[in-house]
Swiss-Prot record:
Annotated PANTHER family: RIBOSOMAL PROTEIN BS6--L-GLUTAMATE LIGASE, RIBOSOMAL PROTEIN S6 MODIFICATION PROTEIN
Keyword terms: ATP-binding, Ligase, Magnesium, Manganese, Metal-binding, Nucleotide-binding, Protein biosynthesis
Positions annotated to bind ATP: 141, 178-179, 187, 211-213
GO molecular function, one term: metal ion binding
EC number, as in UniProt: 6.3.2.-
Binding residue positions for Mg(2+) 1: 248, 260
Gene name in the database record: rimK
Enzyme class: ligase
UniProt-listed HAMAP family: RimK (MF_01552)
Name assigned to this protein: Probable alpha-L-glutamate ligase
Length: 302
């Protein structure tokens, strides 16, 4: 098979590992810079041009689209879909998962566990919004933030009100969530491929930090997840329509709650923590599914 990997940086760990895994299994792989792809939208024969030439056909595309280029990246991915190329995660599913508010609404409709989450526009509603999520301590999140950026822990109602007012004054879209104190600064990342959790790790926040993102100094270790956590992760990925996903859970007193469903999960932390060849399992999944007549991923409403 000839596999294309949409990535802006071929030196990134996840991109390198996918190329290595594809070549180790006898395939060819090409890293394609998403932002150098361009296309004639009105053409009756869909195609994509890359650095001055029409790009060659691929048997499969693995999208590694960063959050900052979601709009353009998904436009490129849609063009590959129009060319009947198998895509590991499709453009609709990626767009859906990148919208924090919409994704939580979809997960809620499926009856999956979530932290109490509030969303409001008017500063007049801030006191009631804080009460709605059980009061401080609470977490305030920018809807456009990634890797823990734009996430604030407010330890008092007064602090929460001040931070929310500041964000609203900047016309920033935010959501407010209850703080799951019993998680003790740790979350669980489940890596889902197809209908299986193939690996899981615990991410522990650094000393004095509540955000467990590895980019913020958190540490990762292998963990055994419960059947309920496994089921929750698989159902969350399915609700988003994702074939591969990193599902982040917190262990609350009332069971697992979903923090985020990531459509382009990094491989370095979880491969290092678990010792598993996740990249190889991704390529194996593509082999089993791209070689058969193309199947559309599940299309939940919303």
């Amino acid at each position: 098979m000839h596999i294309g990997i949409l990535s802006r940086n071929r030196r990134l760990y996840s991109t390198r590992r996918l190329v290595e895994a594809a070549e180790a299994r006898g395939h060819t792989a090409r890293v394609v810079d998403t932002l150098r792809c361009y296309m004639n939208i009105a053409s009756h024969r869909p195609s994509i041009h890359y650095k001055g030439e029409e790009i060659e056909p691929f048997d499969a595309i693995v999208p590694r689209i960063g959050a900052s280029v979601t709009f353009y990246g998904c436009a490129v991915l849609r063009q590959f879909e129009m060319m009947s190329t198998y895509v590991l995660n499709d453009s609709v599913s990626i767009t859906r998962s990148r919208d924090k508010l919409r994704s939580l609404q979809l997960l809620s409709r499926k009856g999956l566990g979530l932290p109490v989450t509030g969303f409001a526009h008017s500063p007049d509603d801030i006191p009631d919004l804080i009460t709605m999520v059980k009061g401080a301590p609470l977490v305030i999140k920018l809807l456009e933030g990634t890797q823990g950026i734009g996430v604030v822990l407010a330890e008092t109602n007064q602090a929460a009100e001040s931070v929310i007012q500041a964000f609203m004054g900047m016309k920033a879209n935010i959501m407010v969530q209850e703080y799951i104190k019993e998680a003790k600064g740790a979350d669980v990342r489940c890596l889902v491929i197809g209908d299986k959790v193939v690996a899981a790790m615990k991410r522990q926040a650094a000393e004095g930090e509540f955000r467990s993102n590895l980019h913020r100094g958190g540490t990762a270790s292998v963990i055994r997840i419960t059947p309920e956590e496994r089921s929750t992760a698989i159902r969350a990925a399915k609700a988003m329509g994702l074939r591969i996903a990193g599902v982040d859970l917190l262990r609350s007193n009332h069971g697992p709650v979903i923090m985020e469903v990531n459509s382009s999960p990094g491989l370095q932390g979880i491969e290092t923590a678990t010792g598993k060849d996740i990249a190889g399992q991704i390529i194996e999944y593509i082999e089993k599914n791209a070689s058969t007549p193309r199947k559309a991923p599940p299309k939940p409403k919303g």
